[in-house]
Design a protein with these regions (language model features):
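N-terminal interaction modules that seed assembly of large macromolecular complexes
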Residues: 3, 7, 11-63
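Structural motif
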Residues: 4-10, 75-84
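Short, surface-exposed acidic
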Residues: 26-33, 70-75, 98-105
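Long, compositionally biased
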Residues: 49-82, 96
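Short, solvent-exposed coil/turn linker segments
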Residues: 55, 99-100, 124
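Low-complexity, flexible helical/coil segments
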Residues: 67-70, 88, 109
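Long protein-protein interaction modules used by eukaryotic assembly/scaffold proteins
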Residues: 84, 89-106
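Glycine-rich, aromatic-bearing surface loops/beta-hairpins
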Residues: 112-141
Length: 141
């Protein structure tokens, strides 16, 4: 799937939201679950929504406020590049399939995305999403 410039920008923004959340010290498992089920994610999933024109700082603040998240110094730490890719690939997945963020996260939570990162970040985004969907479908069967 070839994304247009606007869609590609949305993928990069979501990736940077995940990166900023990690830098700010949020528990990323909780943050990603909150993000993927948030009104901000619903806006990014929509055909058109003002959230699509917001920067990553605004999107992050929106999710943090909605979910009432606070930084957690004791939270498990993850590789920041893997988190960046997770944000990117979740948004790409939504564009590719039309699935809402909430449904994607329910099928393939952050732990699963991070577990496939070492091999999947080196293949095309299309193939990575197809493989993640196949894994999720095998697991559900």
């Amino acid at each position: 799937m070839k994304l247009d410039l606007f869609q590609m920008q949305q993928c990069w923004i979501q990736a940077r939201v995940f990166e900023r959340a990690d830098k700010a010290g949020y528990d990323m498992t909780a943050f990603v679950a909150a993000f993927m089920g948030s009104s901000a994610a619903e806006g990014l999933d929509a055909d058109y929504d003002r959230m699509q024109w917001a920067g990553e700082a605004y999107v992050l603040e929106s999710v943090v406020n909605e979910a009432k998240l606070v930084p957690d110094a004791a939270a498990q730490k993850f590789d920041r590049e893997a988190l960046f890719w997770a944000g990117f690939i979740y948004r790409f997945w939504s564009f590719k399939t039309g699935e809402p963020s909430r449904a994607i996260h329910a099928r393939f939570p952050l732990a699963d995305v991070l577990s496939v990162y070492p091999g999947f970040h080196t293949i095309s985004n299309d193939r990575a999403v197809e493989e993640m969907i196949a894994i999720a479908e095998r697991r559900a069967a």
